[in-house]
């Protein structure tokens, strides 16, 4: 809260000065109104052309075209600061500068027995090439159907750490969970281990302030915020939504769980909190180590610290033991959103079923079309959503997409005990994903995310069983639940236009 108050005290005087300056400017420029109007119209015309030519999702384009055509000058300025990905170029330069060092080398995908045919091989080759991260043997993988089960194991692995512990989370919030974890981290730092914590400045704006950071640093823990929130630099977008814990480069945790009490159902402000996650050991942890170090070196002033050695993964054995995993991070700086395209591709390959967990449902048109096409082919497409929302407006926006999906044969379920925060996908008993990617525009196109694709791993059966178990506690949304009133139809249309901003 102190962090928010401090920033408000800075922003309000600055905004007041800007308003005063604009009033004086308007008075001075009054005689030139006609010329200014013409100039603004010409500028708006070129902005519209620029947006039309840009390679972006069409829903996003339509939103900004409406804003700029309705309010030419403020709309154009708003787009430059909040809608234009060029503001993220400094982030991209910092990341590219450090990414080349220590990248895990890709495996020989040709050695993987693709019983599903050539198409899955193409998908994995594309994902390797697109993200720069390798397909690896999954080895020992543990699935977590709740954060309640995941947190104790995380603490135990931290206690067993011998060399380093790295944490990167969107939200860190002091409470029973974080306080117990921080105590263990402080003890490990006192033993001389390399402890690093990275958190997103916007995601933790109301929960984790500089006092918390100074407390960690005073105990020997290195702690940095990702992309500090500075409105004039357009950093509201391009947040670090990734979630990972790496211990000694040998064990890694990821999934939807942040470091706050509600994620382990210690507190239940939105009913029962349903999440998913996993633990991997051995070679797959190397990808997470590299993902963390890439961001740490790009955004920490301490990037001259010695880095742990990344081991080159061995080629997979010809026979499948526990399948394969490909862990990667997605970036808003990419021309093609990796996770969005991956889900479109996997939906096109599905023959039996394709099931999603997601807390928010505001996908782009291409992903909506892919879901509809799969349902038309007879694929059982299901989506589990929250029954109790954490953000009512976002939930209302998500529901505005229900009708379009239900009429195409997609089944939607709402989790009546509480809130679903899981971000997972499973299809045909063959492939699944677990990560941080929500099915909304911000997550698919504007945030840094991490995701893990599992192929023919035992975790897929566990994910499927968990989906069915969760579905049994859900209410299925029926077409008659979505009233076709004219007012609702208009409201839904407006909400869908503005969905990319939420």
How would you name each of these model-derived features?
Residues 1-340, 345, 349, 389, ...:
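N-terminal localization/anchoring segments of enzymes in phospholipid and broader phosphate metabolism
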Residues 294, 370-374, 400:
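Short, solvent-exposed amphipathic alpha-helical segments in soluble enzyme
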Residues 351, 356-361:
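NAD(P)-dependent dehydrogenases' Rossmann-like dinucleotide-binding region
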Residues 357-358, 385, 415, 434-435:
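Thr-Gly-centered strand-to-loop micro-motif
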Residues 360-382, 386, 391:
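Helical hairpin unit composed of two closely spaced alpha helices linked by a short loop
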Residues 366-368, 395-397, 426-427:
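Histidine/acidic-residue-rich catalytic or RNA/ligand-binding cores of hydrolases
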Residues 423:
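Catalytic-core elements of nucleic-acid end-processing and repair enzymes
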């Amino acid at each position: 809260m102190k962090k928010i108050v401090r920033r408000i005290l800075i922003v309000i005087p600055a905004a007041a000065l800007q308003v005063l300056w604009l009033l004086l400017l308007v008075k001075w420029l009054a005689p030139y109104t006609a010329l200014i109007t013409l100039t603004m119209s010409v500028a708006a015309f070129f902005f519209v052309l620029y947006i039309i030519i840009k390679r972006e999702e069409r829903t996003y384009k339509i939103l900004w075209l409406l804003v700029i055509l309705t309010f030419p000058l403020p709309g154009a300025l708003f787009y430059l600061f909040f809608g234009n990905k060029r503001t993220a170029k400094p982030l991209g330069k910092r990341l590219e500068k450090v990414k080349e060092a220590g990248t895990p080398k890709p495996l020989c995908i040709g050695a993987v027995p693709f019983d599903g045919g050539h198409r899955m091989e193409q998908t994995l080759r594309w994902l390797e090439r697109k993200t720069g991260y390798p397909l690896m043997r999954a080895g020992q993988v543990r699935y977590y159907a709740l954060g309640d089960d995941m947190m104790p194991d995380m603490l135990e692995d931290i206690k067993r750490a011998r060399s380093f512990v790295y944490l990167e989370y969107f939200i860190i919030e002091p409470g029973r969970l974080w306080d117990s974890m921080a105590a263990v981290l402080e003890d490990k730092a006192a033993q001389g281990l390399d402890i690093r914590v990275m958190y997103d400045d916007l995601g933790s704006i109301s929960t984790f302030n500089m006092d918390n950071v100074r407390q960690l640093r005073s105990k020997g823990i290195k702690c940095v915020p990702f992309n500090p929130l500075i409105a004039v630099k357009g950093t509201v977008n391009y947040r670090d939504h990734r979630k990972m814990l790496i211990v000694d480069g040998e064990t890694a945790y990821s999934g939807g769980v942040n470091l706050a009490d509600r994620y382990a159902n210690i507190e239940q402000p939105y009913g029962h909190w349903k999440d998913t996650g996993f633990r991997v050991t051995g070679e797959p942890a190397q990808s997470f180590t590299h993902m963390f170090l890439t961001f740490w070196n790009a955004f920490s002033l301490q990037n001259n610290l010695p880095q742990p050695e990344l081991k080159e993964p061995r080629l997979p054995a010809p026979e499948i033991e526990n399948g394969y995993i490909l862990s990667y991070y997605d970036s808003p700086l990419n021309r093609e959103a990796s996770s969005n395209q991956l889900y479109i591709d996997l939906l096109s390959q599905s023959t039996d079923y394709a099931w999603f967990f997601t807390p928010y449902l505001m996908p782009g048109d291409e992903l909506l079309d892919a879901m509809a096409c799969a349902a038309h082919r007879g694929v059982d497409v299901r989506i589990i959503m929250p029954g109790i929302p954490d953000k009512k407006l976002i939930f209302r926006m998500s529901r505005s997409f229900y009708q379009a999906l239900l009429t195409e044969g997609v089944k939607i379920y709402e989790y009546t005990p509480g809130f679903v925060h899981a971000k997972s996908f499973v299809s045909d008993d063959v492939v699944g994903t677990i990560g941080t990617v929500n099915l909304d525009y911000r997550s698919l196109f504007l945030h840094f995310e991490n995701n893990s694709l599992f192929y023919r791993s035992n975790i897929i059966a566990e994910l499927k069983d968990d989906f069915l178990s969760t579905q049994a506690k859900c209410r299925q949304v029926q077409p008659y639940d979505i009233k076709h009133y004219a007012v609702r139809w208009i409201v839904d249309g407006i909400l869908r236009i503005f969905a990319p901003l939420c």
